[in-house]
């Protein structure tokens, strides 16, 4: 499985900039930020596995409107169905669709994952193509997939 650390790289660069922008925009936030200089709002991401593009999107879809704890539980169940690893797009497509429901995905999220998997398998989506796109192009491309909206696409 290839590795795509792109989302984490962006977060590492964006956090200091975002923190400084918030400090300048709001004196109350400035005091809170100054009182906690080591606070990293996205530190929870450090515990997440680094996945390829498809795996990252599976995680993103799983987390739509759910807590981090619920998302992790669903992903853990999914990985158990696939021998302890995140399935590739081809593995997910080859599996019984009920595996997604048994893992905790809603029917709609299952349809979204299968549509994503089809695009990765047939080449309409790839890690390389997504990495070469601008953020706006990534968002436009991913939101063509039913069930992927701007929130999920921007999180990628």
Regions found by a protein language model. Give the residues of each.
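Catalytic DNA-binding helix-loop module of base-excision-repair DNA glycosylases/AP lyases
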Residues: 62, 134-156
């Amino acid at each position: 499985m290839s590795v795509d650390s792109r989302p984490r790289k962006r977060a590492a660069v964006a956090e200091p900039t975002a923190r400084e922008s918030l400090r300048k925009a709001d004196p109350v936030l400035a005091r809170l930020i100054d009182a906690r200089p080591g606070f990293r709002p996205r530190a929870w991401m450090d515990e997440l596995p680094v996945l390829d593009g498809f795996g990252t999107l599976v995680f993103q879809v799983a987390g739509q409107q759910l807590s981090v704890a619920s998302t992790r539980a669903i992903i853990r169940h999914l990985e158990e169905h696939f021998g302890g690893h995140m399935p590739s797009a081809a593995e997910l497509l080859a599996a019984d669709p009920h595996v997604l429901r048994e893992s905790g995905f809603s029917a709609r999220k299952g349809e979204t994952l299968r549509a994503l998997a089809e695009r990765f398998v047939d080449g309409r989506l790839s890690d390389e193509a997504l990495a070469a796109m601008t953020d706006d192009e990534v968002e436009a491309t991913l939101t063509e997939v039913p069930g992927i909206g701007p929130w999920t696409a921007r999180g990628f």
